[in-house]
């Protein structure tokens, strides 16, 4: 069983983390069963967020009475100290616990620091002094903020998108975290569903002994796939290298990662799915993307207000309105049978 230590936190867990964002989409009974199955199989790191609707409550139900056996990380998107304390209180209540193992600032547009006027980092320190949190972390999608967080020495963990589509700058973050004795938690290890070979994804992550990937699962079949890697971890070989190289070529350039930070859209467009529809049609069974329900969602692109709010919020600097239009045009051609994706 491969283990990973999250830097100076000293937290050592199985090198398969459980990303609890997707369980907000399933029933509480199914979510509890999934989380408990993960634990029974050896997973002990569970990552959630106040922003993930009822995800925290489901983990709270799953691990009620066995808190010391799991490591729970959650997040706050608070912009000020008052909201920080509100979020922390709700999270503790939902998770049925009196402490959070790793409390993370959730994708802030800046790196919270003492004296920056927000009171956020000071609140973190006070929460830690009170024993309500044990370690301070930050999550982000922006290289500049991530680098600043590492360089500041203020954080014990960084959660950042990291998969086999990573750039050299992403790889440098992993190296810097190791040098700083800072835990690195890899989100989007499957690039929001664009990577469809979990064995290749796992083999890539396994090359970095300081990286803890968190796999977002909502189906038992998905979970069992990752559980199988606990005792039989995939290793990098020529076949996997060739697959990764192929995907890097196909997915190079500007594409939507599906992070959802552009949401909600004032026109009701499901941007985080619609803006990457062309890729989803070609990298997964296309029938699921051509249902009447999905057609209705894509048609909403016609209602785009061109307010550019999504563009301004995108942590990857994408021209989201243009990307939506390109995906919609391609989608219409596929629907009309003018373009084959099979």
Describe each model-derived feature in a short phrase.
Residues 1-70:
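N-terminal binding-site loop/beta-alpha segment at the start of enzyme catalytic domains
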Residues 44-50, 73-74, 134-137, 157-160, ...:
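Short catalytic-loop micro-motif centered on adjacent basic/acidic residues
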Residues 2, 34-35, 58-62, 87-91, ...:
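A general structural detector for well-ordered alpha-helical segments in enzyme core domains, enriched
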Residues 6, 18, 46, 59, ...:
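Conserved, mostly hydrophobic/aromatic
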């Amino acid at each position: 069983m491969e283990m990973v230590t999250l830097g100076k936190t000293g937290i050592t867990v199985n090198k398969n983390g459980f990303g609890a964002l997707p369980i907000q989409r399933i029933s509480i009974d199914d979510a509890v069963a999934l989380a408990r199955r993960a634990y029974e199989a050896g997973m002990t790191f569970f990552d959630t967020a106040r922003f993930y609707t009822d995800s925290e409550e489901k983990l709270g139900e799953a691990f009620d009475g066995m808190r010391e056996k799991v490591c729970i990380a959650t997040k706050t998107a608070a912009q000020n100290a008052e909201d920080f304390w509100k979020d922390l209180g709700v999270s503790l209540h939902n998770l049925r616990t009196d402490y959070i193992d790793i409390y993370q600032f959730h994708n802030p547009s800046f790196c919270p620091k003492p004296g920056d006027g927000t009171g956020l980092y000071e609140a973190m320190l006070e929460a830690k002094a009170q024993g309500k949190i044990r370690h301070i972390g930050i999550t982000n999608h922006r290289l500049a903020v991530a680098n600043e967080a590492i360089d500041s020495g203020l954080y014990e963990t960084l959660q950042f998108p990291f998969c086999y589509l990573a750039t050299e700058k992403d790889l440098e973050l992993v190296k810097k975290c190791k040098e700083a004795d800072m835990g690195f938690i890899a989100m989007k290890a499957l690039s929001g569903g664009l990577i469809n070979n979990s064995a290749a994804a796992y083999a890539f992550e396994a090359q970095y002994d300081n990286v803890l990937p968190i796999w977002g699962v909502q189906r038992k079949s998905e979970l069992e796939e990752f559980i199988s890697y606990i005792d039989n971890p995939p290793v990098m070989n020529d076949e996997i290298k060739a697959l990764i190289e192929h995907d890097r070529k196909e997915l190079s350039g500007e594409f939507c990662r599906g992070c959802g930070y552009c949401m909600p859209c004032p026109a009701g467009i499901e941007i985080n799915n619609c803006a990457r529809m062309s890729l989803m049609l070609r990298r997964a069974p296309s029938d699921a993307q051509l249902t009447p329900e999905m057609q209705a969602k894509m048609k909403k692109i016609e209602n785009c207000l061109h307010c550019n709010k999504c563009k301004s919020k995108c942590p990857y600097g994408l021209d989201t309105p243009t990307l939506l239009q390109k995906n919609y045009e391609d989608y219409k051609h596929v629907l009309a049978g003018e373009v084959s994706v099979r």
